[in-house]
């Protein structure tokens, strides 16, 4: 990462942050005016900040350099040729019809064809990062800019594009 910074690129992409050295180099590069994009294995935005802290990233560096954390997941898309209403959802309630996978020739018997992405964005403002870096027990969904992963997944289930099991 340090050798890349010397070439003065506008954007630096770090494939994956796995160790303290890579985390520190990426954070330092962001302080020199470079846009740094990186991947990190974490369950959500809050745990991504905690993971960086666990890797030894200095709190002050995190406060200054994180612009946003985007968390993404892929859900399997229900096959429209064979999806079927979820059994037990025949109640006369004001809830949308939910569907489950069935399986047909179009989807090779899996009940799913393709994938769809769900996302959540955690703004990297200093107050948010400080709360998470200090490991305070703050519900991440209160800090989000938009919907949580769960809300996005439930929305797709309600629209019939994926199953509740996804």
Predicted segments with their positions:
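Short, flexible helix-loop junctions that flank or precede catalytic/ligand sites
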Residues: 1-166
């Amino acid at each position: 990462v340090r050798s890349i910074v010397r070439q003065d690129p506008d954007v630096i992409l770090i494939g994956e942050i796995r160790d303290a050295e890579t985390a520190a180099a990426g954070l330092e590069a962001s302080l020199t005016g470079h846009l740094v994009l990186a991947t990190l294995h974490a369950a959500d935005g809050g745990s991504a900040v905690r993971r960086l802290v666990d890797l030894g990233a200095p709190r002050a560096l995190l406060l200054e350099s994180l612009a946003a954390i985007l968390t993404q997941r892929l859900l399997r898309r229900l096959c429209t040729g064979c999806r079927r209403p979820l059994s037990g959802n025949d109640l006369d309630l004001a809830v949308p019809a939910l569907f489950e996978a069935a399986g047909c020739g179009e989807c090779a018997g899996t009940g799913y064809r393709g994938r769809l992405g769900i996302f959540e964005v955690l703004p990297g403002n200093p107050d948010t990062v400080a709360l998470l870096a200090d490991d305070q027990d703050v519900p991440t969904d209160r800090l989000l800019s938009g919907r949580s992963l769960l809300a996005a997944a439930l929305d797709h289930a309600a629209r019939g594009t994926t199953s509740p099991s996804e």
